[in-house]
Amino acid sequence: MNFWWLKFDDASTESLRNNIFTNNSITKNMRLNADTILNAQSYINPIGDRELNLRGLQIPVIENLGVTEDHYTSLDLSDNEIRVMGGFPRLETLRTLLLSKNRITQINDVKNIAKLETLVLTQNGIATLGALESLKSLVNLTAITLDGNPVQHVPRYRSYMISILPSLRMLDFQRVTQKERDEAEAMEFDVVPVTETDNLSAVDKAELRERLKNATTIQEIEEIEAMLKV
């Protein structure tokens, strides 16, 4: 694994993505619907992964990714308005997920992306260890960064991450040492999991319930129900 690729916001990579995205016909401020996904740019990124570019579209909710037919090894949802990391269909091929520069405060429903190896969550709003509890499902995760999240300042944050992610090799661009593993294994953590709806406003919940009434596919119904914890 080339961990340097995690630093994807450097000038050269940003320029590459912007150049690729210049001719994208997707309209901003839209829901992540099937048309948006199918019309998005895809390409082979610098480390040879087939990547779908959905960055910078002001997307508020992760949804409808089933239309990708599990075709991509890398998914870029950076620089959007996403509040909850969840709503994924089963994506057995996905290995890298980029969610930098969103508004994420909660992680939920990640069992369907259990093959994920790299997760980038820089510059979000995750504030508690409980909000990270669902990451336990990512048993293959080897690299994650939460730089720019308030949770980094929580006592024993690093030890907690190492304890729930035994496959982790790189955390916040720093290699996980054997000493850290031993220390984390010896610790006990009193963490209360945060449910997804704990961070949804009344307006958000009302909007989701309205969308549930108007849903037309089983997949959409299941995704919304998961977000509402019905």
Curated annotation (Swiss-Prot):
Pfam families: LRR_9
Cellular compartments annotated: Nucleus
Secretion signal, residue range per the UniProt entry: none
Name recorded for this polypeptide: U2 small nuclear ribonucleoprotein A'
Subunit structure: Associated with the spliceosome.
Domain of life per record: Eukaryota
Gene Ontology terms for molecular function: U2 snRNA binding
LRR repeats (start-end): 15-36, 48-69, 71-92, 93-114, 115-136
Key word Repeat present: yes
Domain called LRRCT: residue spans: 149-187
Organism: Yarrowia lipolytica (strain CLIB 122 / E 150) (Yeast)
Key words of the record: Leucine-rich repeat, mRNA processing, mRNA splicing, Nucleus, Repeat, Spliceosome
Family: Belongs to the U2 small nuclear ribonucleoprotein A family.
CC annotations in GO: post-mRNA release spliceosomal complex; U2 snRNP
Function in brief: Involved in pre-mRNA splicing.
GO biological process, one term: mRNA splicing, via spliceosome
Keyword Repeat listed: yes
